[in-house]
Amino acid sequence: VEIALTDGGTLSAAQVNDLSVAGTANCYVVSAPGTYVFNARVRGNGAGEGVGFEPAIEMADGMTADWLWTDSEGLVSGVALDTTSGDIFLTVGEGRGNALVALMQDGKVVWSWHVWVTDAPQTMTYGNGTVFMDRNLGAAGTTAGGTDAYGMYYQWGRKDPFYGGEKTETSANAFLEAKNGTVVN
């Protein structure tokens, strides 16, 4: 079966790994280079009462898909939408990091998904039975003190992560130094 994509390319269904086969989500973990697909007809996992939005997304003319940002050069490419199936396809290269992939209608973001490329996270069970991942959400590594262990930053009320940076600030006015050049200034 050949799949026609909005960027003009085609893919064979046998070449594609389905990220949403076990269910839809706002974040997908990818652990190896390859071509991937996920269901873009559902916002997040589509569940919940009173979430304030319609979970179903209807495909329409003018819809496209692309990546909005990545913290690792060349991490994702070939992002395309199949408007017939409502699936987004992307190719993940070598390396580790994060990307934000979006479904757009006439250039405006309809919904976005965090694609986290890392070796498969492991779980750790504490003495009291609490289970955690072995890394921060979005972290490329697990080395204590290493900048690849920082992960992503989240703001209350937002589902999409922000890039965590590659260094720490230790001076007394670290906040002021960290925000220089942002919209706040």
Predicted regions and their residues:
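Short, compositionally biased
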Residues: A4-N185
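Surface beta-loop-beta hairpin patches that serve as ligand-binding interfaces in beta-rich domains
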Residues: V1
